[in-house]
Amino acid sequence: MKKRLNIFLLAFPLCPVFQIQAQEKPNLVFIMADQWRGDALGCLGKEPVKTPCLDQLAREGVNFTNAVSSYPVSSPARGMLMTGMYPHKNKVTGNCNSANAPYGVELPQDARCWSDILKANGYQTGYIGKWHLDAPHEPYIDTYNNHGAVAWNEWCPKERRHGFDYWTAYGTYDYHLKPMYWDTDAPRDSFYYVNQWGPEYEADKAIEYLNGHIDKTQPFALVVSMNPPHTGYELVPDRYKEMYKNLNVEALCTNRPDIPAKGTEMGDYFRNNIRNYYACMTGVDENIGRIINELKRLGLLKNTIVVFTSDHGICMGAHEQAGKDIFYEESMRIPVLISWPEKIKPKTDRTTMIAFADLYPTLLSIMGFQQQIPEEVQTFDLASVLLCGKENNRIVQPYYYIQSSNPATGYRGLRTDTHTFTIHATDGKVDKII
């Protein structure tokens, strides 16, 4: 830690990051969606999606327009976020499911997560929504996504929650119109279903948390992890679908050679899902706005860091890919918006290539805990970019795709501002360079 600190001070001697510890500790509201592409913000003008609340958040803070996910798959991305370490080191080399469970794929209980550090420093902590960092084990939880060849959903016991003392969450579950949850004290077999769209219910719970579960004289950190716009695109309230019923989908395909032709499998996959994908985003946006408005109403926003991001994007048919576990822009690029009225200059775009996992050291630094970042953290501390406007366009971010059954297999890559270089290996032997 001393080496990390000295390098930071030499590089940015006038940056106010280290003045924060003597002031009031900021609150943190960390909101993430699942599978939200980086270009899909109305304020960017690149995709015809309506996101007025996030556009306002971008105006009130920093919009990282070149943000990426280094391993664009749910569990590995979340594992890197929570630990600040890359997959080979944090052991989350693939999605947490029964197929990968024999290889130890889950968030280690002894990992030092950023939430552990905040809890140790007196923060009240809450987690709402999708977690997806525990390996399913027999007898499997009785949910629809545990009845096939691979089980996906799992409860997280208190000792594995890494400092979060309020809990309304689930492992992974994609039926968005009737989601399921475990509450803080619920045992493994006592989950419940809600007849309400997931993001709406999770915003309700966030508002309830802000009003009834915290001492407002003490700092708090709340994560709200919304599953849409993850697949199950059609599982969104009709009022959001109505907003896109007249969208000219063919116009979106113009001058896009990466989108296959109409009548092909992947071309039709894109055309059949893009309206509902945008509808999910608009619904998530509206519910994020509800949370932010409640922070304002309670007088908490001024000293609250609000983050919006996503674990990864999605190809949705582009490049002949339905999914996200690939190095293309649609998969790797994500939104990262950060506001803090007391400290962060509004209406600021940054081109520094921040990664999803860089939020661990970056947020701890701007919150005043830079000296407590563990030595094993591997990701970039970009607090200077947030607080001082020190762009760093020389950052090179890694790219991963790993077969958990054989970690020497899969893709490895490097991404610069202009290029992505990847290699594919089978049993440790390189067989493809891209």
Per-region residue spans from a language model:
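Formylglycine-dependent sulfatase
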Residues: 2-8, 13, 20-432
